[in-house]
Curated annotation (Swiss-Prot):
Catalysed reactions listed for this entry: 3'-dephospho-CoA + ATP = ADP + CoA + H(+)
Record: residues binding ATP: 12-17
Protein's recorded name: Dephospho-CoA kinase
Organism encoding this protein: Streptococcus mutans serotype c (strain ATCC 700610 / UA159)
Job description of the protein: Catalyzes the phosphorylation of the 3'-hydroxyl group of dephosphocoenzyme A to form coenzyme A.
Broadest EC class assigned to this enzyme: transferase
EC numbers for this chain: 2.7.1.24
Similarity comment: family membership: Belongs to the CoaE family.
UniProt keyword Membrane, yes or no: no
HAMAP family assigned: Dephospho_CoA_kinase
Cellular component terms (Gene Ontology): cytoplasm
Cellular compartments annotated: Cytoplasm
Gene Ontology BP term (one): coenzyme A biosynthetic process
Keyword set, alphabetical order: ATP-binding, Coenzyme A biosynthesis, Cytoplasm, Kinase, Nucleotide-binding, Transferase
């Protein structure tokens, strides 16, 4: 019986550090952000759906999605925002489901990294949910270093997300990513041993 583990956490919580480590250990990881990127690439299903809806004005000269223009159009009205969410979420969910079902045929244990796993009701897909937990101070520090955000921008990004405490209710396992990378890897190793022995 395949075990499917969902990985989630707030922005700059260190999900990619953990998923890269899982890949190094030989596990398959479906990355929702990468799936979205693939779908939005020229000719992808999301690309086609957005062009059909909003027209070629959302494309740049190379024929790729002009993300600033797209954001401007989507966020210009509540109706556009609602339609965009509905359209994109349906296509993304279908693609994630297809990839999940493919891996379930060949893998004993695999992982899916979905940043909005809890908020967008993916919970029933998983045997377990791992929440990557870090302090808001750590997230802000990483956002400033990694994304070049100001203190205010970083705080705004955090404020727009579901709080960690609210997410903890849905988590089966919590990986504390406040300390060193080595410490985090030790926690992951411990969880992997437990999964393999069950």
């Amino acid at each position: 019986m395949t075990k499917i583990i969902g990985i989630t956490g707030g922005i700059a919580s260190g999900k990619s550090t953990i998923t890269n480590y899982l890949r190094q250990k030989g596990y398959q990881v479906i990355d929702a952000d990468q799936v979205v990127h693939d779908l939005q690439a020229n000719g992808g299903r999301l690309y086609q759906a957005l062009v059909n809806w909003l027209g070629t004005a959302i494309l740049n000269e190379a024929g790729e999605l002009n993300r600033p223009k797209l954001s401007q159009l989507i966020f210009s009205s509540p109706d556009n925002l609602a339609k965009s969410s509905q359209l994109q979420n349906a296509i993304i969910r279908q693609e994630l489901e297809t990839r999940r079902d493919q891996l379930a045929k060949t893998e004993a244990i695999f992982f899916m990294d979905i940043p909005l796993l809890i908020e967008q009701n993916y919970r029933d897909w998983f045997d377990e949910i791992w929440l990557i937990a870090v302090s808001p101070e750590t997230q802000i520090k990483r956002l400033k270093q990694r994304n070049g955000y100001s203190q205010e921008e970083a705080q705004q990004r955090l404020a727009s997300q579901m709080p960690l405490q609210a997410k903890k209710v849905y988590a089966d396992q919590i990986i504390d990513n406040n300390k060193t990378v080595e410490n985090t890897k030790m926690q992951v190793d411990s969880q992997l041993r437990r999964l393999q022995n069950e």
